[in-house]
Amino acid sequence: MEKISAAITAIGGYVPDDVLSNAMLEKMVETNDEWIYTRTGIRERRILKDPSKGTSFLAIEAAKDLLNKKGLDPKEIDLLILASATPDMPVALTGPYVASQIGATNAFAFDLQAACSSFLFGVSVAAKYIESGRYKKVLLVGADKMSSIIDYTDRATCILFGDGAGAALFEPNYEGLGVKDEILKSDGIGRNHLYIKAGGSLCPTTAQTVAEKQHFVFQDGKTVFKYAVTGMADVAEEVLKRNNLTNNDVQWLTPHQANKRIIDATAERMGLPAEKVMLNIHKYGNTTSATIILALNDYEQQLKKGDNIVLAAFGGGFTWGAIYLKWAYDGAQVKK
C-alpha cells in the first residue's frame, strides 16, 4: 500500500473590518506608534466589535471562504477541528457549532487548545487522521476573538492582540507532498508567565475576580520573550537538520506572528533572508490560533507545488514547535 501523506489542498481566511491602529491606542493608553512598532512590528490589528458575535463567527467566515475558493461541498468533510484559545463558551464546544453552521453535517468536530501553538498542534492532529487512511477530508480552523480577553487599559497586552481566523483543508496525498516532519514541545513552567487567572476550576468566577480583572490575559513579557526567542528558533533549526535541509532548500518560513523580533531571530537561526519569511503582523497583530494560517492565506498566490515550508510557533503553557511540509498545489491558480 502506498504511503499516505496529509497535504493542505485549500486555505481560507477572515479578519473583521474594524481596525485598531497604533494611533488609536495612543488615545487609550500611554504609548505611541514608534514605541509599539519598534518593539513588536505591529501597526494595526482587526477587532470584532459586535458583542453578540464570538470566535465561532470568525471561524465560520474563514471556513466559508475556503469552501467557496475550493468549490467544496461541506457534506464531504469528515472532521472539523477548531483550534482556539477563546471558545464561545467554557462548556459546549465551539467546533461542533461551526461544523453545523457551515453545513458539514457528516463531520464530527472538536476543539483543540494550545494557546498560540493551537493551529500548529492542530496541523499535527489533522495529519494523523488523514494518515490513518480512515478520513479523506479534515478541516482545521484556527480562530480567536482575542479582544474578548484583553484589558484595554493594560499597555503590556492591549497593543499585541487582534481578532481573526483561517482555515486549512487536509486531504490524502500519494506524491510525497504534505506534512513531512514535526517537533512539538511543552513545558508547564509557562503557566506562571502567561495566563488568565480566573474562570477555571482552580479559581472560579466570583464578583471579586471580575472586579480585580482576573479574566483578562496576563503576560510577563520579558520572560515570555526570552523563552519564545530560543524555543521557536531551536525547533525550527532542528527540523531542518533532521531532514537534511539547508537554508537554500527552504522556500518559506511561516512563523507565528507574535513579535517581529522573535520572527527575525528564528529566521536568522535558520539562515533565511527576509524575502523567505511570511510576515503580516503589521496588519493583524497577534491573532493567536489564526496567525500561521492567515499568513499562508495572505501569501497563497506565491506558493508553488513542492515548496518546502517550515511552520513554527510558540505559545502559553508553554507550548512550541515546528512542522516541515511540502506544499501541494500552485497558489497562483487559485481564484480569490
Residue ranges and their predicted role:
Residues 75-83, 247-256:
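Short glycine-rich phosphate-binding loop at a beta-alpha junction
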Residues 1-50, 154-226, 230, 234, ...:
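Condensing-enzyme catalytic core mediating Claisen C-C bond formation in acyl metabolism
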Residues 9, 83, 113, 138-144, ...:
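Short beta-strand segments
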Residues 42-46, 76-81, 100-113, 148-153, ...:
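Glycine/charged-rich beta-loop-alpha catalytic/anionic-binding loops adjacent to active sites
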Residues 69-105:
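Anion-binding (especially nucleotide phosphate/pyrophosphate-binding) glycine-rich loop
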Residues 131-165:
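Flexible, glycine-rich active-site loops centered on histidine and acidic residues
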Residues 56, 60-63, 67, 86-87, ...:
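Claisen-condensing/thiolase-fold acyl-transfer catalytic domains that form or cleave C-C bonds
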Residues 29-38, 89-103, 139-146, 201-209, ...:
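Acidic-glycine-rich active-site phosphate/pyrophosphate-binding loop
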